[in-house]
Amino acid sequence: KLPDKVVIHINDTHPTMAIPEMMRLLMDEKGLGWDEAWDIVTHVFAYTNHTVMSEALEKWPLDMFRKILPRVYMIVEEMNRRLMIRLNEVYPNDSAKHKYMAIISDNQIFMANMCLASCFAVNGVSKLHTDILKQDIFADYYNMNNDHFYAITNGITFRRWIANCNPELTELISSKIGKNWIKDASELSKLKKYAKDPAFKKQFA
């Protein structure tokens, strides 16, 4: 049920630790098995990449990570093991490709690869940027999961910042155009006819 209610946005690689931490919570605190927890996690997280510069794709020393977060490291290690099985199925006997697509490689943990292996959606912030991700930076991940990649210009979600956070405005909008706008933003264009309506403007203010 959780993926029907919540999407967690990994906005660049900085919040990536949320992925294995949610696995830990679901398994250790809620008693779920790996497969059930993984099915939830891989339908909750979405990843936005902001730059094609490799310097911005975070990686962390394995020894430090394992020392500070031993349980989370165990989960990341299992994520990587399962990823390696998948990579060998998709790109058999290509050890060089497996190495740079791995979550754990050369005694480092690669956060972008963790996102690519875990998120149901991956987007660049423009069509050109996304084309570069698909054709160059993340090309082999794109070939493996091409239905995960999108070009989306960043913005806010009106469902959270209007529908959830501003019930008065939500009620006003819905009273004029119905509730379909909550699922379809294009419906908001119906408000144009009220732009010069004194009563509506007074309520809006």
Where are these regions (language model features)?
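Catalytic cores of carbohydrate-active enzymes across secretory and cytosolic contexts
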Residues: 1-205
